[in-house]
């Protein structure tokens, strides 16, 4: 009863595209029905309480199955979920339902969630990015070019004072942002409060000398939500413009709580995707990053790391640009060549700035400005701090290269 090819999807349905590999001997229709059942109202047997509700109203429906070209025994199963199955404004509940139990199902050898269509009726119940791209540009007074960042290295082991010195040199050299590495929380060699204080001093000194607004992504991620909020509050009291969160290791509930605080208190929110490859790297099993990106846009974040296409971390060009559009744009058409299975309408939800980071350096600048355009953050860690003349010259090199590439694009020279 969960495989219903005659079903006409509604504008209010959440639609999911699963790449499924059934066990040998299990028909695709049976596997698709099992996915729809286990991720909605079904269980392993008929229960007498089924008669106390309207399963027809609440069940997920597998409404289409198509074989994957070039793959043996692999199918895309399309499942529609009625909106009443989900709590409003909760990414946690949405993912618990759709990907909670079904991935361990015996009838399947592998299962991957490739895409979700979030209807406006549901997306409008979420906070979304605390500020969004345009508000961030207005806050920073920076327009017409990608923003430049740098992750402070070595990621672990620096004292707070030396860390602050590196921040100052990079910002003084021309970068817009510096960043805590995702590993940096509050360790014995550098407690969070000391780091925040030295970084704030570096920020204000660099701002005074350059006349530009500067930021450092102060990582508020912590072992408890209460401690995370305490760090965000201290960052705001210091006058820092932006904080950071590891949204997958920290969790969506914590992330949305922090996003609400950031919106109410004028803080930008930078999101790191540490742990994403555990979930999204296998081609046949897990969750594609485009789904994690959509979930983040709803949960709340102004920046998120989105791969580079050209650096040390994996990322296919067309697929990467597909989820970059899903992060930034209001309306994204279905385009299977870019891995986009459904047309997505975000209506008025603000966009998220994609961050290119990981093994990139100044020689990648022409490709990065062409691929990501103006509305992006290009982040060079080793590509700044690895400059043979030091941190500040590394920052100068990146700023000069960025402005040269933007000028070339504007003048039609490329």
Curated annotation (Swiss-Prot):
Subunit structure: Heterohexadecamer of 8 large chains and 8 small chains; disulfide-linked. The disulfide link is formed within the large subunit homodimers.
Chain positions recorded as Mg(2+) binding sites: 179, 181-182
Molecular function (Gene Ontology), one example: monooxygenase activity
Binding-site positions, substrate: 101, 151, 155, 273, 305, 357
Entry-linked InterPro entries: RuBisCO, RuBisCo_large_chain_AS, RuBisCO_lsu_C, RuBisCO_lsu_C_sf, RuBisCO_lsu_fd_N, RuBisCO_lsu_N_sf
UniProt keyword Chloroplast, yes or no: yes
Major subcellular site: plastid
GO terms, biological process: photorespiration; reductive pentose-phosphate cycle
Active site: 153, 272
More about this protein: The basic functional RuBisCO is composed of a large chain homodimer in a 'head-to-tail' conformation. In form I RuBisCO this homodimer is arranged in a barrel-like tetramer with the small subunits forming a tetrameric 'cap' on each end of the 'barrel'.
One term under GO cellular component: chloroplast
Protein name, UniProt field: Ribulose bisphosphate carboxylase large chain
Protein species of origin: Onychium japonicum
Family from the record: Belongs to the RuBisCO large chain family. Type I subfamily.
Keywords: Calvin cycle, Carbon dioxide fixation, Chloroplast, Disulfide bond, Lyase, Magnesium, Metal-binding, Monooxygenase, Oxidoreductase, Photorespiration, Photosynthesis, Plastid
E.C. number: 4.1.1.39
Role noted for this protein: RuBisCO catalyzes two reactions: the carboxylation of D-ribulose 1,5-bisphosphate, the primary event in carbon dioxide fixation, as well as the oxidative fragmentation of the pentose substrate in the photorespiration process. Both reactions occur simultaneously and in competition at the same active site.
């Amino acid at each position: 009863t969960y495989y219903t090819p005659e079903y006409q999807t509604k504008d209010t349905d959440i639609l999911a595209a699963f790449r499924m590999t059934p066990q040998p001997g299990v028909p695709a229709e049976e596997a698709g029905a099992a996915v729809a059942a286990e991720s909605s109202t079904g269980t392993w047997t008929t229960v007498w309480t089924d008669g106390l509700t309207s399963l027809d109203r609440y069940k997920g429906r597998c409404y289409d199955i198509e074989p994957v070209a070039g793959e043996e025994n692999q199918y895309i199963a399309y499942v529609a979920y009625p909106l009443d199955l989900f709590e409003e404004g909760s990414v946690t509940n949405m993912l618990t339902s759709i990907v909670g139990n079904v991935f361990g199902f015996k009838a399947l050898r592998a299962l991957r969630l490739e895409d979700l269509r979030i209807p406006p009726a549901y997306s409008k119940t979420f906070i979304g990015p605390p500020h969004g791209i345009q508000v961030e540009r207005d806050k920073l007074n920076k327009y017409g070019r990608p923003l430049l960042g740098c992750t402070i290295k070595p990621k672990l082991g620096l004292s707070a004072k030396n860390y602050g010195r590196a921040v100052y040199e990079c910002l003084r050299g021309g970068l817009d942002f510096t960043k805590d590495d995702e590993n940096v929380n509050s360790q014995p060699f550098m407690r969070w409060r000391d780091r925040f204080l030295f970084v704030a001093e570096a920020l204000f000194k660099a701002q005074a000398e350059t006349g530009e607004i500067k930021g450092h992504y102060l990582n508020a991620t912590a072992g408890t939500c209460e401690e995370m909020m305490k760090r965000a509050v201290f960052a705001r009291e210091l006058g820092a413009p932006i904080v950071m969160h590891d949204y997958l290791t920290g969790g969506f509930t914590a992330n949305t709580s922090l996003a609400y605080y950031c919106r109410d208190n004028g803080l930008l929110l930078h999101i790191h995707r540490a742990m994403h490859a555990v979930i999204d790297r296998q081609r046949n099993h897990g969750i594609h990053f485009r789904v994690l990106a959509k979930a983040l846009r709803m949960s709340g974040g102004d920046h998120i790391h989105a791969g580079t296409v050209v650096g040390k971390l994996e990322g296919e060009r067309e697929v990467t640009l597909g989820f970059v559009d899903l992060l930034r744009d209001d309306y994204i058409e279905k385009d299977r060549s870019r891995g986009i299975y459904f047309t997505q309408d975000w209506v008025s939800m603000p966009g998220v700035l994609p961050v290119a980071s990981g093994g990139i350096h100044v020689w990648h600048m022409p490709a990065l400005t062409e691929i990501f355009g103006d509305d992006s953050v290009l982040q060079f860690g080793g590509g700044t701090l690895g400059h043979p003349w030091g941190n500040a010259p590394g920052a100068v090199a990146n700023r000069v290269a960025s402005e040269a590439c933007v000028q070339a694009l504007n003048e039609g020279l490329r």
